[in-house]
Amino acid sequence: MKEEVKGIPVRVALRCRPLVPKEISEGCQMCLSFVPGEPQVVVGTDKSFTYDFVFDPSTEQEEVFNTAVAPLIKGVFKGYNATVLAYGQTGSGKTYSMGGAYTAEQENEPTVGVIPRVIQLLFKEIDKKSDFEFTLKVSYLEIYNEEILDLLCPSREKAQINIREDPKEGIKIVGLTEKTVLVALDTVSCLEQGNNSRTVASTAMNSQSSRSHAIFTISLEQRKKSDKNSSFRSKLHLVDLAGSERQKKTKAEGDRLKEGININRGLLCLGNVISALGDDKKGGFVPYRDSKLTRLLQDSLGGNSHTLMIACVSPADSNLEETLNTLRYADRARKIKNKPIVNIDPQTAELNHLKQQVQQLQVLLLQAHGGTLPGSITVEPSENLQSLMEKNQSLVEENEKLSRGLSEAAGQTAQMLERIILTEQANEKMNAKLEELRQHAACKLDLQKLVETLEDQELKENVEIICNLQQLITQLSDETVACMAAAIDTAVEQEAQVETSPETSRSSDAFTTQHALRQAQMSKELVELNKALALKEALARKMTQNDSQLQPIQYQYQDNIKELELEVINLQKEKEELVLELQTAKKDANQAKLSERRRKRLQELEGQIADLKKKLNEQSKLLKLKESTERTVSKLNQEIRMMKNQRVQLMRQMKEDAEKFRQWKQKKDKEVIQLKERDRKRQYELLKLERNFQKQSNVLRRKTEEAAAANKRLKDALQKQREVADKRKETQSRGMEGTAARVKNWLGNEIEVMVSTEEAKRHLNDLLEDRKILAQDVAQLKEKKESGENPPPKLRRRTFSLTEVRGQVSESEDSITKQIESLETEMEFRSAQIADLQQKLLDAESEDRPKQRWENIATILEAKCALKYLIGELVSSKIQVSKLESSLKQSKTSCADMQKMLFEERNHFAEIETELQAELVRMEQQHQEKVLYLLSQLQQSQMAEKQLEESVSEKEQQLLSTLKCQDEELEKMREVCEQNQQLLRENEIIKQKLTLLQVASRQKHLPKDTLLSPDSSFEYVPPKPKPSRVKEKFLEQSMDIEDLKYCSEHSVNEHEDGDGDDDEGDDEEWKPTKLVKVSRKNIQGCSCKGWCGNKQCGCRKQKSDCGVDCCCDPTKCRNRQQGKDSLGTVERTQDSEGSFKLEDPTEVTPGLSFFNPVCATPNSKILKEMCDVEQVLSKKTPPAPSPFDLPELKHVATEYQENKAPGKKKKRALASNTSFFSGCSPIEEEAH
């Protein structure tokens, strides 16, 4: 009852969940550590919190329930209300701990939460209490967006639920569905129905996040079957709160954001209630009505309930701030004091109250009339009452005397009993020592005999030392007995002193009487205990004596038993022999007399065996009796020890009671003395006041005379007061400057600390995001390593050997391992930085800092100075913000202008790029025509092979003319290369301008790899725009077979031997030159693209045949001499084989790369055929004399090759870049 009046604190259990896979993938670390064997948790390195229960991540659900929740259920059956409350941030495991997502399929799983286990335990206890009748009702509600919804009602729209407050029953919910349940299965089905109706949604932090507060209530009413009027009512509230959340982490939008705002609002009101109840200094208003959640939990927090708060936290360091807030709220909740009472039925309580009132009135009536008077007495009531009062007074006085005597007798009895006990203990010790000394004396005699026999000097010395020690022991035992006797005498003297103290007043008589009765009762118990102890000890003594006397008999019986057993064995053997002899004698008729004797002997032996067995059984019974006696003796000794301990405790209790009574008596005596002294002082003060009154009456006359003088002095004092006030104002104005400086410095420091704290939080969030990205990269690399995939290298299309592929795979695995190690090292470094920052924030943000912050402002003057300084800082910050905003607007406008310019330049770049692409297409077409021309010349050389056989001189002239044509073509190709180089320089200039524009706009509108990569397929930068474009023609050059073969083989080798790393070098090495543009008038021959059949052909217009300098196709041209003869044949072959078709450069064929250009470079097969033809021609050339000297011809050819060698590099580059979009490398294909 005393605890209920004082209040019972709210019990807090801390539960920490393990790290979830998402936190592990983000690289989060544990920020909580647990003290083994203690309910204590440490945040960081030195900030610790202590609670009633602490459960680490490895704790199972069953242990949490049995340790923290199960004790509350016992109080529910005693009539007390109980509440289990789960509190914490979102995703911390509240619904898991409470079992808010329970279904019937999880019945026997170890992950079942608190609510299903509570239901099972309730019905188990109900089954045990067979003498009570129980009625159970359940209700289930949720608070969603500050609206109460009934989860057990099938149609939520119809239910209108309101909260009402009853002065007798407390908070009531009107309109809430309550279902009566009889078995546990019905209750579980109600729970499952409510869980299915509960509002749940997914957020970025939790896939199954509770969006409402849920309260499952079980109402229990119990009545005794024997007494229907006595009944108890209790309620058990099981609360699963929604978790506090941050929009930054949950990324909630729309309805989820609105739900999160309402959840945080309700939890804020709950936190305010916890803070108000947990602060002992405030003791003021508690804001229960701020939200519906706190209104419903009014009895659970600071009211009529046993409450347990399960604080659920996350151990991840990314949630440190939310975890710390939860720990602080839980620590405050431990300071809340509840006042639970037994909830009795109002009718039963009223009935019991009336019964007590009737009893009190009956007692008062008896006291007034002196008991029930018979009707025959005719004496007046007043005289009878007077005599009864006198008699009562005399009886009271006699009772007081008897109580004093009883207390004195009890004290003396206690003292005597204490002496007896001490003497008994001393006697027992002495007997034990006597026994030891006897044993020592026997040992001493043995040792002396041994010494005499062995004559060893060392043993004699040891024996002397033992004798000295025995004497010392006896002396010490005598001293201890003397000390005990002295202690007993001092105790007796103290009691005598106490008894000789002055008598107390009548007000202490009741306490004295109670003390005397207690002492008498304990003395009586002690006497009875001593009697029982004496009987037990006597019985034990007798039984031990009997045992000692029975011991030799026991030995004798054991010997007799052995002898009897031997005799029985011998007689048994003899009996068996006789039986055998009788069986043999039956066969022989002559031995009848002998068998008769043997039969009699057999009967005698059987009688002896029976007698011996009887004796054996009797002696074994005696031995068993001896063993039972020993057991009884040991049991008696144990009971004697227990009774002695009980006697000691009773004596100690009597002594403590006597000591308390003595202290109380001394205190009362001291109070009486103080009261007497106070009365004397009051009398003296009364006399003193009388004298003072006389003096004051004499002084009064004098004061009236001095009134005028006092009036004058008052005016002077007022004048002085005004002067002092003026001086005070001046000092205050002077002191205000010092106060302002002090307040300014203090506020500056506080603002700086708060700003640095916020910056540290921002850096902490950045570090957490960095670690999250690093963890994702590590996870991706590990997945690639486990699956055997390689990172996609940028390689050209080529054929790899098996060893190269294996080498690349091993190199890629090593690189992945190194990347993983470097990333893990970086993650460890980030984790160390995060832990350091979090520890600094914990040190900076102490719980008392907000309270201590305003303690420095104690006066209105300091508050004014602080307000003035803050207003000044606010104005200056506003001005600075406006300046920054104006500069930001200017930078935005300049950025917009830059973007506009960049957009225009990009459009211009696109136009120039399209023009260059068209120009390149034209150049490619011309190049293809030249290749076809060379192939036609090769065909012509094959046709002329027969003519070479006829005349060597004609063949030599034709070869020289071919060489000349090839030289001219080579010169033209060089001019084309120079033009290409010029275009590339212009490209580089425009590219630099574009880069400058991007830097000026501070935005990378084009990706860096698209603009600057040497491997890009779109590396064309347009030249400066010109006002007018003039169509130009490029010079044509011829190229001999050897040059084409060399260039083609070199390009093929480069494609086969080069990889992705050598692309940049190749692209940088080749720098095409700008083609030289010549006017139309310098071009010789026609520029037809068709058959040269009409007068649009320049050569036909001038009435001349097309020649080598013409751009027309020799196989199609009708204006050539050789083409006129075989026109029909050429036309047929042109349409089928030799015609040139310009392919669409944007057409993509499956399996080929994007922008696969027309293959203009001859492949190795064609070049090989060319070489074979040339070798045949050279072999078939006869060594006949001719107008041209062949050695000279060879000399000219070698000189030509030597002159041509410096230009091979450019030719090779030109041959490798003759594809579509010449001047840029082809698109690289990823290795799959």
UniProtKB/Swiss-Prot annotation:
A motif (Nuclear localization signal) lies at residues 793-798. Residues 1132-1142 have a biased composition (Basic and acidic residues). There is a cross-link at residue 1194 (Glycyl lysine isopeptide (Lys-Gly) (interchain with G-Cter in SUMO2)). It is found in: Nucleus matrix; Cytoplasm; Cytoplasm, Cytoskeleton, Spindle; Midbody. Residues 1086-1144 are annotated as: CRD. Gene3D superfamilies: Kinesin motor domain. SMART domains: KISc. The modification Phosphoserine is found at residues 394, 801, 810, 815, 951, 1001, 1013, 1017, 1028, 1126, 1186, 1225. One of its GO terms (cellular component) is membrane. Disulfide bonds: none annotated. Interacts with the cytosolic iron-sulfur protein assembly (CIA) complex components CIAO2B and MMS19; the interactions facilitate the transfer of Fe-S clusters to KIF4A to ensure proper localization of KIF4A to mitotic machinery components. Interacts (via C-terminus) with unphosphorylated PRC1 (via N-terminus); the interaction is required for the progression of mitosis. This is Chromosome-associated kinesin KIF4A. It comes from Homo sapiens (Human). The gene is KIF4A.
